[in-house]
Design a protein with these regions (language model features):
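Soluble accessory domains appended to multi-pass membrane transport proteins
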Residues: 78-134
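Membrane-contacting alpha-helices and adjoining membrane-interface segments
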Residues: 3-80, 117-133
Length: 134
């Protein structure tokens, strides 16, 4: 039994780390801006109670309207964490056979054998065959 990492493992791990780092950076930036804005408004004497209540209502409305987007992003996060496939892997997904060219949080692009570039929402990927993983 050979447990050594295969060729390209370091590049694949670096790509995953870069993507996950980008997600965490975006989340942290959003949190910092929201907290800073709330603190500045509080210093100017604004009553933040109604603002927070309104933000909650807007959050529910946006959440209901963006269910597909949220599903795609969550699927992308789990796909990255579970390392289901990566750039350069040969995959069969939906009715497409080809090579993964880009993996994003929302969309994965696959170059089909006939040369067509397919953009697949991560939330649509229910089953996937990865010929590159042994």
């Amino acid at each position: 039994l050979d447990l050594r990492p295969g060729p390209g493992t370091a590049h694949r791990q670096a790509e995953r780390a870069r993507t996950i780092g980008s997600v965490l950076t975006s989340i942290l930036n959003a949190v910092v801006w929201i907290v800073a804005t709330a603190m500045v408004l509080g210093e100017f004497g604004f009553n933040l109670g109604p603002v927070i209540a309104s933000a909650g209502i807007v959050g529910v409305a946006v959440g209901l309207g963006a269910q597909t987007l949220v599903r795609d992003i969550l699927s992308g996060i789990f796909m990255l964490i579970e390392d289901q496939y990566g750039v350069g892997d040969r995959v069969d997904v939906l009715t497409i056979s080809g090579v993964v060219e880009r993996v994003g949080l929302r969309i994965t692009t696959v170059r089909a054998d006939n040369g067509t570039l397919w953009y697949i929402r991560n939330g649509e990927i229910l089953t996937l065959g990865n010929a590159s993983k042994k």
